[in-house]
C-alpha cells in the first residue's frame, strides 16, 4: 500500500514525542510492507525543525535514514495550483494532499486527521492504520 507520511508522524520519531512507538512501527512497515512517500516540502521543514531542537547533523542524519525507505512525491506547478483550490484551511495540509495525489497514495498518515476531512485522499493516524492493517504474524515453525 502506498502511504504519504505527514511531517508530524516523522517528528514523533525524530523528537521522541508522544506517539513515537506507533509512528516508529508504521515507518518500519514502510521499509518492508508498504511504500512510504514524503512531500517534497516536508523534507526541508523536517530538517529545519529537527535542527532547531537538536543539531544540523542529527537533522540531516534523520532525513538520510528516512530516504532509505521513503520516496519523495514528484510535484510541480500544476500540483501547487490544485492545492490552492482544495477546500482546506491550511495550505501546507493542501500541499500534503497534492503530494499524496501525485504519488498515488491510498492514505495520508498524520496526527491531525481532522485537518484532512476535505481531502480526497483519506487520512488516518498511525495507531488507526496499524489497527486496520496489522502486520501479519510470522508463520509458526512446523
Language model features: what each stretch is:
Residues 2, 35, 72, 108, ...:
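A residue-level structural signature of the nucleotidyltransferase/glycosyltransferase Rossmann-like core
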Residues 5, 38, 75, 111, ...:
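A conserved hydrophobic position in a structured secondary element of the catalytic/binding core
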Amino acid at each position: 500500500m502506498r502511504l504519504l507520511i505527514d511531517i508530524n508522524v516523522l517528528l514523533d520519531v525524530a523528537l521522541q514525542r508522544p506517539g513515537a512507538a506507533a509512528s516508529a512501527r508504521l515507518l518500519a512497515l514502510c521499509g518492508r510492507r508498504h511504500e512510504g512517500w514524503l512531500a517534497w516540502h516536508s523534507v526541508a521543514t523536517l530538517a529545519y525543525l529537527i535542527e532547531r531542537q537538536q543539531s544540523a547533523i542529527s537533522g540531516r542524519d534523520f532525513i538520510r535514514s528516512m530516504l532509505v525507505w521513503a520516496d519523495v512525491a514528484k510535484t510541480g506547478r500544476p500540483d501547487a495550483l490544485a492545492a490552492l483550490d482544495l477546500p482546506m484551511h491550511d495550505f501546507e495540509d493542501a500541499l500534503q494532499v497534492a503530494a499524496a495525489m501525485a504519488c498515488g497514495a491510498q492514505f495520508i498518515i498524520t496526527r491531525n486527521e481532522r485537518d484532512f476531512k476535505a481531502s480526497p485522499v483519506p487520512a488516518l493516524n498511525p495507531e488507526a492504520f496499524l489497527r486496520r492493517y496489522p502486520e501479519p504474524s510470522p508463520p509458526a515453525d512446523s
